[in-house]
Amino acid sequence: SEMCIRDSNLKALGFNTVETYVPWNLHEKEEGTYDFSKILDLSHFLELAQSLGLYAIVRPAPYICAEWEFGGLPAWLLTKECRIRSTDPRFMKYVKRYYQTLLPKIVPHLVTHGGNVLMVQVENEYGSYGEEKAYLRQVKKYLEEGGINVPLFTSDGPWQATLRAGSLIDDDVFTTGNFGSKAKENFADMAQFFEAHGKKWPLMCMEFWDGWFNRWKEPIIKRDPEELADAVKEALQIGSINLYMFHGGTNFGFMNGCSARGTIDLPQVTSYDYDAPLDEQGNPTEKYFALKRMMAENFPEMQQMEPW
């Protein structure tokens, strides 16, 4: 399958873990009707990754961002009188109900049950949106009550303000940062935040942005492959990273999201090629081979193979 080939190409690069978001609005398009079939078969995705020798990281909503329609929240929530991404019980009851269907698909695949899922994310970059810790704690509680007993984590921009607002460091939830360059500076900021809270935690970039998304009426954004390889090398000498994206693919239908700048809407294009190491069709690019060369030179202990 295409999924198998793409995961194989990640393994071939010398990486050991695959990460995925879980878009609520695809799994519960219509209220109360769930779909985990075909390309939405999360269990199959995790089993496939494990069969290839890959660990997995799961980021299961409620909100995922990802330049995805409504950040992954189902459109039918807009017909409800509720405040999203908050402790509003009218919102959280739907999160809880969704988790009761979703989490049993993840729990058997946790490393604690012989599976490959290492970590699970609480919300997503909440520090860029709000600072209601009670909401984050409630999401954490629902994950734990649903049987998630691997490390939970948050991910936010690596700045003190966003880390303060979006992390649950005082609840011992692992804190990760999202950035695409200047690893030394960004990891130093994170280390400072950890130290201020009495933590000696490892440093991890949960989204190392290797390309960028594209909006209508704006030029296509490209990143030099060798410059990226150098930036990844710098990051890996200090901490761990998850490439965002390794493969971007396509926003089919109306799933392309829309951000805003002031009062101006900034809709995404249909393609989510992202100038990633695998192109929209899933083929290795120059960026892939630049990363592969860098990995072979600097991390020879990570076994590589020829890509498909």
Whereabouts are the PLM-identified features?
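An active-site-proximal structural segment forming one wall of the substrate-binding cleft
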Residues: K38-V58, K80-V117
